[in-house]
Amino acid sequence: KTVGVLFNAGEVNSAFQVEIFKKAAAAKGVEVLEATVSSVNDIQQAVTSLSGKVAGLWFPTDNVLAAGTSILAKAANDAKIPTIPGDEALIRGGCLATIAVDYYTLGRMSGTMAADILEGKSKPADMAIQTQDAQKPLINLATAKAIGLTIPEDILKNAAVIEK
């Protein structure tokens, strides 16, 4: 299988996430084709360049792609390419599915850590790094239908679903 990766190489956070993704993909025997964008004006052409070459598109949390969600989703959906973004907001914008960071939960975790510091219960240098437990998949059923994809019931029963 081949997966397309779309990102703004000028965003250090995006490039970092892509490197991690490429290593994970290689470990699973998945080929990665990259397409980079520097503005929302590049998104349509980048998706088109990957069309017919990839089984799906993955992209990290990226400001350019977030700003161009509607363009990205339309281009990929028109080409019948499943999209898996790193941010759940893009699912609401028309991308297919993700398992992403829950920013509300992350904020609560950070707030608890900050309170512990302010109350003198912990010192930042002594605190363990915290991560979220795995989240539920978030799936846009309207997008699945638009690209001709049927999501298996065993996945749907454990997912949060958007139907618009």
Which functions belong to the PLM regions below?
Residues 1-164:
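Short hydrophobic alpha-helices and adjacent helix-cap/hinge residues
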